[in-house]
C-alpha cells in the first residue's frame, strides 16, 4: 500500500515538473519510461536536444535537498536508461542530455522548482 501511495505522489510531482517544463518551452514526449536500463521520469525536446529528466521532491525539513538526493548509483542508472533508450530508438546521433528537476514546497508560490540542465554526465 505504501508503494502505491509513493507511486501516486511521484506521478503528481512528475506532472508538476512537466507543466513547469512545458511553460519553459519543453515539449514532453514520454513519461515514466521503463526499460532494461532503468526508469526515466520524463523525456522531452528542448529545441533539437532530447532531454531525459529525473524529477525529485523533498519536503521542508528534509536532510538533503532534491538535487543532492540523486546518488552516484542513481546517476549511473539514469545514464544506462538514457543510453538504452537512445540505442533502442536509433537516436545515437541525436544531441541529448540528462537534467534534474528539484521540487520543494514554496513560500510565495505552491512549489519552488530548480532545474539543473546537463546535471548528469556519462563517463
Swiss-Prot record:
This is UPF0102 protein Maqu_2464. Belongs to the UPF0102 family. It comes from the Bacteria. One of its GO terms (molecular function) is nucleic acid binding. It comes from Marinobacter nauticus (strain ATCC 700491 / DSM 11845 / VT8). InterPro entries: Restrct_endonuc-II-like, tRNA_endonuc-like_dom_sf, UPF0102_YraN-like. It holds the Pfam family UPF0102. Gene3D superfamilies: 3.40.1350.10.
